[in-house]
């Protein structure tokens, strides 16, 4: 039996080439596959089959000089690994796991000569990345993301605040104030507002600076650690000042700060790189935010390959 043929539809196919092209265009938008299917009057299976016709090909003969590593939550309890070209923002790879074995097996596909071209890798403070990066890329410099360093210190300050707050009577104004206005302690003191607000907890109009002063007056230990915490800022990016401050105070601070300081000293070379080099994970974090938007629009992905 003869089969009619036309340039509009491939042989033995029922979906026109134009429709498939339109599906491909919409697949790069932040739209669920079910919405694409409904818009073009095709089945969701057709959209999925069209998606699978595209393959993410890896060029094993190229790696950029500057890379960014990070992870994101693919689904509850499962972290995936993402690599991005720092300069072009092109995604180089998305791996379903962030284990050392998975990362090593992926990058060992690249010849050593290609891997030797990599000069800088930015990453967060996930220590398993350090070892694997040094083994795979012998000439690279590891640059810790400055935001994660600040966040690490900030979380320690928050734990100290909670520890001191829990020593107060939970019915007292001191406890309620410390719990309600905790963000003022975490905030950069130079950015506190001078505007007056009526605060029910204190039953008066106060500025943020005045509220902060009240909170610090409840505990001398809290005040001392807050003042130290405020000295750790990267606006001036002075590595010598940063580490001399740690060395001068490590023996007389709360054990929570001591643990943090020891980690920072251990990662001193990577933190110095973060302060001296113009690289960070900011661009990759923007990509991760886009991934979160896609996941939210599609209510998640069950199949990693489809993602």
Predicted segment positions?
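Alpha-helix capping and helix-loop boundary segments enriched in small/acidic/polar residues
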Residues: 10-14, 94, 98, 144
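Active-site catalytic pocket residues across diverse enzymes, especially alpha/beta-hydrolases
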Residues: 55, 137, 157
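Short, surface-exposed amphipathic charged segments that create phosphate/polyanion-binding patches used
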Residues: 155-166
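Short, polar/flexible loop-turn hinges at active-site or ligand-entry regions and domain interfaces
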Residues: 7-12, 140, 164-169
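Acidic/histidine-rich catalytic cores and adjacent linkers
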Residues: 51, 76-77, 81, 95-96, ...
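RNase H-like nuclease fold core
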Residues: 46-120, 125-132
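Short, positively charged, Gly/Tyr-enriched micro-motifs
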Residues: 1-67, 72-78, 115-118, 271-272
